[in-house]
Amino acid sequence: MPRSLKKGPFIDLHLLKKIEVAAEKNDRKPVKTWSRRSMILPQMVGLTIAVHNGRQHVPVLVSEDMVGHKLGEFAGTRTYRGHVADKKAKR
């Protein structure tokens, strides 16, 4: 279920402060965050945000199409290595 419009989008305050500082300085370095639950706001467009996936920080370049989605959607947490082939099926 989506969040109520009355409440507005959720974003962690520490992440919002980092984004405001990066936007003021026009800093090209990625903004590191562990907050996968924060929503992408229009102020983030054009910034690179390094989202933690449980093991490392994945750089995500924010575009206009991503506004309204959560940061965690763009940094996968699981690696898919494919299904193991059965020896009998190869014959």
Swiss-Prot record:
SUPFAM superfamilies linked to this entry: Ribosomal protein S19
Keyword Cell membrane belongs to the record: no
Annotated coiled-coil segments of the chain: none
Keywords: Ribonucleoprotein, Ribosomal protein, RNA-binding, rRNA-binding
GO molecular function, one term: rRNA binding
One record GO biological process: ribosomal small subunit assembly
UniProt keyword annotation of Transcription regulation present: no
GO cellular component: cytoplasm; small ribosomal subunit
PANTHER family: RIBOSOMAL PROTEIN S19P FAMILY MEMBER, SMALL RIBOSOMAL SUBUNIT PROTEIN US19M
UniProt similarity note: Belongs to the universal ribosomal protein uS19 family.
Function, as annotated: Protein S19 forms a complex with S13 that binds strongly to the 16S ribosomal RNA.
The protein's name: Small ribosomal subunit protein uS19
Encoding gene per record: rpsS
